[in-house]
Design a protein with these regions (language model features):
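Nucleotidyltransferase catalytic core that binds NTPs
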Residues: 1-185
């Protein structure tokens, strides 16, 4: 029986922190499947920086030098906004019926996990693998049973929103420089 990790997220954009999580999880699991999602249920009005296809291209490029047991699956590309984590877990349970599934989520998502749609059913099909960062392995307050993936205090403190804001700022600066915008006033 293989251990299969499902690592889903909006990944807008996918960054070095996400890659580190996938690499660390791949050390404990037989396979890690990165699953970019179509929408963010907790921030439905959030601004999108990249299209789904662009996110897939970025992830594919970033995992090209990662261990071979890290792959990407774009199953959510053609799904509507009603597609949820439970649907993704069910899909992979059908693909890997005799294997053990792990749903890889961050500590922030884990704290809200009991509010997820059909979270009890998710737990029947998959073990949660919670990415824990910080100074101590004992910091995680358990809200539901889970396995911990301790990244450590030297974990790259990156977030998609920080990366997105930096990209937008740099792109805007490039645009303004190219357009000679400042000299028009």
């Amino acid at each position: 029986m293989a251990k299969i990790g499902i690592f889903g997220g909006t990944f807008d954009p996918f960054h070095q922190g996400h890659l580190k999580i996938a690499v660390e999880a791949a050390k404990k699991l037989d396979k890690v499947i990165i699953v970019p999602t179509i929408c963010d249920y907790y921030r439905p009005d959030s601004r999108k920086l990249f299209t789904f296809d662009e996110k897939v291209a970025i992830i594919t490029k970033m995992i090209s030098n990662a261990p071979g047991n890290i792959v990407i699956d774009s199953l959510e590309k053609d799904k509507d906004s009603m597609w949820r984590t439970i649907n993704t877990v069910q899909y992979f349970k059908e693909q890997y019926p005799n294997d053990e599934l792990y749903l890889i989520i961050g500590e922030d998502s884990y704290k809200n996990f009991p509010t997820w749609f059909r979270y009890e059913d998710i737990l029947l099909m998959a073990t949660l693998m919670v990415v824990q960062r910080g100074n101590s392995k004992d910091d995680l307050v358990k809200v539901v049973p889970c396995e911990e993936l301790y990244i450590g205090k030297d974990f790259l403190e990156a977030s998609s929103s920080k990366v997105r804001n930096k990209l937008i700022s740099e792109l805007m600066e490039m645009y303004l420089d190219d357009a000679d915008w400042y000299n028009k006033f």
